[in-house]
Amino acid sequence: MLSPKRTRFRKQHRGRMKGISYRGNHISFGKYALQALEPAWITSRQIEAGRRAMTRNARRGGKIWVRIFPDKPVTVRPAETRMGSGKGSPEYWVAVVKPGRILYEMGGVTENIARRAISIASSKMPIRTQFIISG
């Protein structure tokens, strides 16, 4: 599972996801990519599940790049706890994804293999996505 080695602060505000992604919205490494169409928090488990699905489907050959990293801690309160007494402890990590953001890239395979692998990875994501080709 992906997570930062160390952070400056243990806990973060939840924040808002306004507008579209201006960074990381162009294909940089591969030829094919999976692009987000909705805003969401994508957990490190979901990122890993998508990566595994793509790797398994592409078999040998082809390279996969994960273009998002979960750097936001999400805190959870214990069950049946009364209000107050501070913020919960960090439970898992999420990547903040805005519309237009590239999630995964793929290269070194034919289009139909890439399309199939990326469609399987997109089914692991909690948002609507689209398959795009560079050029």
From Swiss-Prot:
Residues annotated as signal peptide: none
Any one cellular-component term (Gene Ontology): chloroplast
Family named by the database record: Belongs to the universal ribosomal protein uL16 family.
SUPFAM superfamilies: Ribosomal protein L16p/L10e (SSF54686)
Main location: plastid
Name of the gene this protein is made from: rpl16
Name the UniProt record assigns to this protein: Large ribosomal subunit protein uL16c
Subunit field text: Part of the 50S ribosomal subunit.
InterPro entries listed in its UniProt record: Ribosomal_uL16 (IPR047873), Ribosomal_uL16_bact-type (IPR000114), Ribosomal_uL16_CS (IPR020798), Ribosomal_uL16_dom (IPR016180), Ribosomal_uL16_sf (IPR036920)
Subcellular location: Plastid, Chloroplast
GO BP field: mitochondrial translation
Gene Ontology MF terms: rRNA binding; structural constituent of ribosome
Keyword terms, alphabetized: Chloroplast, Plastid, Ribonucleoprotein, Ribosomal protein
